[in-house]
Structures are given as structure tokens and as C-alpha cells.
Amino acid sequence: SVTMPIVLDSTEPQVLQAGLERLAGRCIINSVNYEDGDGPTSRFGRVMPLVAEHGAAVVALTIDEEGQARTAEWKVRVASRLIDELTGTWGMNVGDILVDCLTFPIATGQEETRRDGIETIEAIRELKHRYPGVRTTLGVSNVSFGLNPAARMVLNSVFLHECVEAGLDSAIVHSAKILPME
């Protein structure tokens, strides 16, 4: 029997509902965000009643009506809005929220993406300062997309280390492609 929470990942609320109804134990919903707002017909507004009914935890992405948050300030602003609504309106425990501050490829050659990794690290640090009980997670390898495999391994390893130092609690990584850092 599985004792770890199962993460249900779908953009369709009816798929999440089917999973929640069939799985024993506690689940984590991946994900909630404000991409299409927070009204009752938004995805957020349709998913959150399911989360509340089943006592699920959530992965909260730093995406709002303007798009995917790129700067540390924007990421923290969206995360704070999500945390405040999830704990205030929906009665969730802050420890049941896993904020994904998102990271983006930094090797695109475009000036506007050069600081994306730093912005993510700074957002994690500030978020953990403001909300010590919140959990954080991150898809680490997004930062190195487009690089050759050897460069990806090095960048992913260093980036993961820096994110953990900033307060990252969990990460989505290919463990065989991470170098130990001390």
C-alpha cells in the first residue's frame, strides 16, 4: 500500500474529481493558479471546492491573469495572493501549500531571460521569509532547457543547490543527472 500522497495533475477539474474520489488517502492537486482569474467559473474556482471537500494539498503556481511571473517581486506577489486566499477563504493550512515559483530557460540568448534563475532564487528566499510554514517546489531542469546534456547537468546541480540554500523544500529532478554539491 502507498503511504505517500499521490499527486494528481490535470487541467480538467472533472479528471481531478475522478482521481480524488477513487484514491484512498490524501492527494496533492497539481496545480492551482490565477491564469484565468479566481471567479467561480475560473479553473481555480472550479478546483478549490474539490480540494476543500477532499482535504487535498495543492501545488500553487505563480501564474496570474497577466501570465507566468518572471520577476521575484511578481512571483512573491502572486504567491502571497494565492496563500492568503487558500488559507483565508478556503481554510487551508499553510503547510499544505507547495508554491512553485517557476523557472525558465536562461540560455535563450534573449536579454530578458538572463536573470530568470536569479529571480526564482530570490523569490524562494523572500517567500520563505514571509511565510516560514509554506512549502516550495520547483521543476529544476527548466532552467537549463536548450543546453547540451553536460552543461544541463552542471547548471541544474548548481541551480538546485542555490535554490535549496534559499529555502526550496522539494524539487522535480532526474536524480541521476544531479551532481552532489557541498
Model-derived features: positions:
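Active-site-facing alpha/beta catalytic cores
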Residues: S1, A18-R26, N30-V32, P40, ...
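Alpha-helix-loop-beta-strand connector modules within alpha/beta enzyme cores
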Residues: S1-S10, Q14, A18-A24, G117-T136
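Catalytic beta/alpha-barrel core
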Residues: T3-E12, C27-G39, V94, E112
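Unusually extended, aromatic-enriched hydrophobic runs near protein termini
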Residues: M4-L23, C27-I29, P149-N156, C163, ...
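Catalytic alpha/beta core domains of metabolic enzymes, predominantly
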Residues: P40-S42, R46, V51-E182
